[in-house]
UniProtKB/Swiss-Prot annotation:
InterPro entries: Arg_succ_lyase_C, Argininosuccinate_lyase, Fumarase/histidase_N, Fumarate_lyase_CS, Fumarate_lyase_fam, Fumarate_lyase_N, L-Aspartase-like. One of its GO terms (cellular component) is cytosol. The keyword Nucleus does not apply. GO terms for molecular function: argininosuccinate lyase activity. It is found in: Cytoplasm. This is Argininosuccinate lyase. Pfam families: ASL_C2 (PF14698), Lyase_1 (PF00206).
Amino acid sequence: MSTREGSLWGGRFADGPSDALAALSKSTHFDWVLAPYDIVASRAHTVILYRAGLLSEEQRDGLLAGLDSLAEDVADGSFTPLVTDEDVHAALERGLIDRVGPDLGGRLRAGRSRNDQVATLFRMWLRDAVRRVAAGALDVVGALVAQAAAHPEAIMPGKTHLQSAQPVLLAHHLLAHAHPLLRDVDRIVDFDKRAAVSPYGSGALAGSSLGLDPDAIAAELGFASAADNSIDATASRDFAAEAAFVFAMIGVDLSRLAEDVILWSSTEFGYVKLHDAWSTGSSIMPQKKNPDIAELARGKSGRLIGNLAGLLATLKAQPLAYNRDLQEDKEPVFDAVAQLELVLPAMAGLVGSLTFDVQRMAALAPAGYTLATDIAEWLVRQGVPFRSAHEAAGAAVRAAEQRAVGLDELTDDELAAISPALTPQVREVLTIEGSVSSRDARGGTAPARVVEQIDTVAATAARLRERLGGPA
């Protein structure tokens, strides 16, 4: 049997927990990241206890001095958990008692439970963590915008079903990866409204009878408000699940971008060249330059999805209020943040370092008869019903395939034989430049619209960064 050393409970137990139980319960190997937040919250709690008349001025000052000393030792690594410490809370209480004595150190626990304490600390940590993730996502957006701005007129094959579809601007395609990331960051901004609610003062589940002020400690800790329901405050982790979803969504969005880079850098596509600093080689094939960053980003998206699924499964069947299952809420979220903090800067660097072969992309843009839609829409503008126009454009493709030529290489007579409406003027849309320029509605791939889009995306990113409290 183990002892109860390092535990915050045990008065009604004759013996300590078994070694197996102690090992299962131990969480300092992952929750120690909450230690700085725990100390900040304990400082605020000390002030609230003093205001409630539960501490004298001398006791308040003694606790604050002890917490300051403990914070310094945690920061420089001279104070760390012992193997006997059950969790971050127990370790820090031990450290405080070592500095101020058991009588004074033991007073800090009045009016709070680990249930409201850890729920608060988790929110504090997560509110900071999502800002770091958002900043990383905006860096990827910045790299996409920079590449788009550097290639305002480059044309590439647009694809659906991975088949050649219509010509589009490279910048338009790159910005199509930026928009989802902007929405992810916007979700993070919106998430903070729900995360900025403090559970502190809720106790184990029923609130406190000691005259403490939850709103006051919420304000001290930078929360917008205190929780309205103490049971909900201690037992709910929807804020963690919401963050885990956004992290998984960022992973999915990065994975789609990564997939494009992987395809584009292949010999068969040949759209981009990878920079030496952002790619790897082979242990046996000297010629290889591998898109490892993109492949790892694609692989880690599955891990992020798994973290979300695991967290939701943990939450799905717990009765109110707190259950020890909730010890399992933090590792998936901590891991998701850690993975994104690795992937995001790597993806930003990868995107920013890509060298595009714009001549090859332009040469491939009309391949696969991607101008067929332009023929159909040109006929519609001449008054031909779209059904008939679609059939005529399809017939033009068939004729070009039979001769193994491009649509622009069909003769005037061949076009007229397909449809009398196909006059020589149709050739104005049988270029990739004419095709993209014609798509001038909002959201289209016309150069003028894409230039506007670059400005809009850059401005949106700057606005979101400002709302998150970071430099523009």
